[in-house]
Every structure is written in structure tokens, then in C-alpha cells.
Amino acid sequence: MGSNSFGRLFTVTTFGESHGPAIGCIIDGCPPGLEIAPEEFTHDLQRRATGKSRHTSARREADEIEILSGVYEGRTTGTPIGLLIRNTDQRSKDYTNIAQQFRPGHADYTYWQKYGIRDPRGGGRSSARETTMRVAAGVIAKKWLKQRYGVLVRGFLSQLGEIRPTGFDWDAVEDNPFFWPHAAQVPELETYMDALRKSGDSVGARVDVVAGGVPPGWGEPIYGKLDSELAAALMSINAVKGVEIGDGFASAAQKGTEHRDLITPEGFLSNHAGGILGGISTGQAVTASMVLKPTSSLRLPGATVDADGAVVDVITTGRHDPCVGIRATPIAEAMMALVLMDQALRHRAQCGDVGEVSPLIPGQADV
């Protein structure tokens, strides 16, 4: 079976290519009765969209959702939900000269080796255009989690190149095109990105995502660990090369007395574990980070070979993001929400008869 589906009880299957007529997804396992309307998808889809600032790809897609099934009179019916977005701003001619060339750092060569055929237009299925439908599915998961459990999922850009936030304010994240948590640094980011774009190069980034209000008990003890599924979900996003849960790799330099999250009746004293112990949520905020590599489609020449094995220099002239991490925040939020909703439904199915167990350690009031 092709790996285009995600989840166990709450499943999402995406389809479509970057320059095809449309992209879409089928969502199965959504509980009935959730109110949902096409306009509710707009906010997150526009957060992910290209062409919203000079710091992202110039491609401009309307990203208007069509609900094809699974919703009647504004409420989910419990049957598969079909969502579709039509592509309207493809420019496939940009890829004519490189259709037979393998871009270094891109999926061109691996797709060719796996399938023996590939769609070179905009990267085809390997394009981040596919993540549009993950964000759409995430809108449903976010709403259900918020209504049913009070869970709030949100993220921010925590590193762009070598620049890191020098302050933090959640309110600032939605007020700039970088999803940056410190408004005073936005001019510095703009200057950096303007120079990068002029040079024709690209840069990597880091995104942090946090889910507050997650109850204790979600996740499985071995193969369905909450952190392992969250890591896999974030790693499935285009260009992601590393994922951390909680303190992640910084744990290697910590001592046990520092890393362990001490417990009091009033709550945990820290959250180095990222809200997950033994693969199961603790009731604290679930925290994760992902690192995205620099965009590999560049205007600068790079050595490669073509489909005949001849040595060539490739130059990509299409519309591309100089930093894919800028638009990755809503994608990371969506993937965390999808994992959490799937885990919540699985927990309810197996352990719905388990009442509240004492003692119940309070989680963090704010994240």
C-alpha cells in the first residue's frame, strides 16, 4: 500500500501534485456532529500560503476549500470527509529546461530511482504544495480538540539561519510574516531575508510547536508512543531533517537531577520531557521542535547529472521559498493536531471506562 495515509482511527489521505489540476484529501473517522464551514479553513490556509510577503515564493493560489462529502447542513456526519482545492497558478514552463536533470538536495533523483518516472513540474508530489491539505485536515482536528478537551495547538519560528528570538510574546507570532515571537527583531529578519534573496541562496530554520491542555493518558506504551508518532508526523513534512521532543538533544548534556521533572501536588516543577513520559501524555504541555533544511531549488548553478548520466550544471528558475521554514509553522501545528486527535480517539476507545485517577497533577496553566 502506498504511504499516502496517516493515522489509525482518525485518518487523512492526501492526493495531488504541485502542478496538477487539484490537490485534496479524504478524512475518515471524524466524529459526527462537529460544526464546520468552508470559511473556517481560510485562516490557517492563508497562514501557510505563498505570495503573502516578499520573503516566500511568489506563487499565488486562492486555496479555496471545496467540501465534497461528509458534511451535511454544516455538521460532520461521521462519514468520510472529502476536501478539494483547485490549483490555479501553476507555471510549468519554468521546469522545461530541468525536466531531465536531478536537482541536488531535491527528491528528483530518489523519485526517479523508486518509480522509474516522475512529474518534474514544481516537484510533483514531493512539493510542499501537498501540505496544504494537511493544514486543511488540521483545521478540523484543532477545532475538535479545542471543543472536546480545551486543547490549544500553536507554533512559532524559533530560529532562522543563525538568528534566534531574544524575547517571547505569543501575541507577536500572528502579527508578522515570520511567525516570530519577538516583534522588535522583525526588521532584522527582513533585512537578512532581503539580502539572502538577492544572493540567490537559501537558509534553514527551526519551528517549535506546543499543545496546551492535553489531558494525561494519551499515547501507547510501546509502538504507539505519543512522542514516536509525533516525531514521525513532523519528520514527514517536506525538508524536515530533525525533530526534538521536549529538551530533545540537549538532554545529552544534562544530568538526571536536572532533566527529571520533579512533581508536587501543585504541579510539575519543569517540563524537560515535553509533556510525555513512557510514550503517554503527562498533562503538561506537549512540546516539539523540528529543523528544516535550506531550500534546494536555487538560482545559483550546481553540479549534477541528467537522466542520461551526463554531467550538467542545474539552475532552477521557478518560484521558490528562500526559507521553507517561514511557512512551516501552520504545517507543524496541523500535524501535531492530527496526531493528538488520533491518539485521543484511540484512548477513548480503549480506556473510556477508566475514570479520573488520583492524584491528578495539574498541568501548566499557560503555554
From Swiss-Prot:
It holds the Pfam family Chorismate_synt. FMN binds at residues 125-127, 238-239, 278, 293-297, 319. NADP(+) binds at residues 48, 54. The keyword Transcription does not apply. It is an enzyme of class 4 (lyase). Pathway: Metabolic intermediate biosynthesis; chorismate biosynthesis; chorismate from D-erythrose 4-phosphate and phosphoenolpyruvate: step 7/7. It comes from the Bacteria. One of its GO terms (molecular function) is chorismate synthase activity. GO terms for biological process: amino acid biosynthetic process; aromatic amino acid family biosynthetic process; chorismate biosynthetic process. SUPFAM superfamilies: Chorismate synthase, AroC. Reduced FMN (FMNH(2)). Its EC number is 4.2.3.5. It catalyses: 5-O-(1-carboxyvinyl)-3-phosphoshikimate = chorismate + phosphate. InterPro entries: Chorismate_synth, Chorismate_synth_AroC_sf, Chorismate_synthase_CS. Keywords: Amino-acid biosynthesis, Aromatic amino acid biosynthesis, FAD, Flavoprotein, FMN, Lyase, NADP. Its cofactor is FMNH2. One of its GO terms (cellular component) is cytosol. HAMAP family: Chorismate_synth (MF_00300). This reaction introduces a second double bond into the aromatic ring system. Belongs to the chorismate synthase family. Homotetramer. This is Chorismate synthase. It comes from Xanthomonas campestris pv. campestris (strain B100). The lineage of its organism: Bacteria, Pseudomonadati, Pseudomonadota, Gammaproteobacteria, Lysobacterales.
